[in-house]
Regions:
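C-terminal ends of transmembrane helices
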Residues: 20, 76-92, 154-161, 208-215
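Helix-coil boundary and interhelical linker segments in multi-pass alpha-helical membrane proteins
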Residues: 49-60, 117-138, 185-192
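Selected alpha-helical membrane-embedding segments in polytopic membrane proteins
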Residues: 27-121
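N-terminal juxtamembrane cytosolic/stromal segments of multi-pass membrane proteins
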Residues: 1-31
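Structural signature of hydrophobic alpha-helical transmembrane segments
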Residues: 62-70, 135-148, 197-201
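Membrane-water interface of alpha-helical transmembrane segments
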Residues: 23-30, 34, 59-62, 94, ...
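Membrane-proximal helix-loop-helix units in multi-pass membrane proteins
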Residues: 100, 104-171
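Terminal transmembrane helical module of multi-pass membrane proteins
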Residues: 152-222
């Protein structure tokens, strides 16, 4: 038996669909930002501490801690699947932003893999370096953090504009400013420590704070 809707019921149905789409647009996003935000924060802070505590070149081996980022992949996949199961309406923005973050993830994985491989290849070629210049073996890592922050800035800014969520836009701008700060501080003798500390702070403002605000918005508290 066919059910005919009057004009009022049709408008109410359309309104519910729009609200559903808007709500589902944010559903689960906060957890994803928190996952990667806390993971990057833990790794960057750990590297900063190890660089400060360990003597000489031994501290630079802490950069291999970035391989721990792989821990977040299965959790990320699980969260995405849960979001897709709960999502009633998949908008065009969802599809575009999905592609943006896939491209971002591939870029980060490529960057981390490239740094690790380059380090393994470059290390043997610097068998003898002058005392105090051991950092020359780890030159590729001086570009790693600025590149990461620039990618963060792009992804956060685009996401913030697409979802009309200002904290993400602000986080993206902060990451871009941090990138400039790091690029002009290459001459500093403690540049690697500075990079990890700047990355730690940037992730707090770019991922962790927006992530918690997104969760509040999902629960209707914002």
């Amino acid at each position: 038996m066919d059910t005919h809707l009057n004009e009022k019921e049709s408008l109410e149905l359309i309104g519910k669909m729009i609200n559903s789409a808007k709500n589902n647009l944010q559903k689960g996003l906060g957890d994803i930002f928190l996952l990667w935000g806390y993971l990057v924060a833990i790794v960057s802070l750990s590297i900063f501490i190890l660089l400060a505590v360990l003597p000489g070149e031994s501290g630079y081996y802490s950069f291999f801690l970035w391989s721990m980022m792989a821990i977040g992949v299965p959790f990320h996949i699980s969260m995405i699947r849960k979001m897709e199961q709960q999502k009633m309406v998949k908008t065009y923005i969802d599809k575009i932003m999905g592609s943006v973050w896939i491209a971002f993830t591939i870029s980060v994985i490529t960057l981390i893999a490239g740094m690790l491989i380059t380090t393994v290849v470059v290390l043997p070629s610097f068998k003898e370096v002058e005392p105090g210049h051991e950092f020359l073996r780890w030159i590729p890592w001086t570009l790693f953090t600025p590149f990461m922050l620039c990618l963060y800035g792009f992804a956060l800014f685009v996401s913030g504009k697409a979802y009309q969520f200002k904290p993400l836009v602000t986080g993206g701008i902060i990451c871009w400013i941090a990138t400039l700060v790091l690029l002009v501080s290459f001459h500093h003798p403690h540049m690697m420590k500075i990079q990890e500390l700047v990355l730690f702070v940037s992730v707090i403002f770019g991922f962790i704070i927006p992530g918690h605000l997104l969760r509040k918005k999902e629960n209707g508290h914002v």
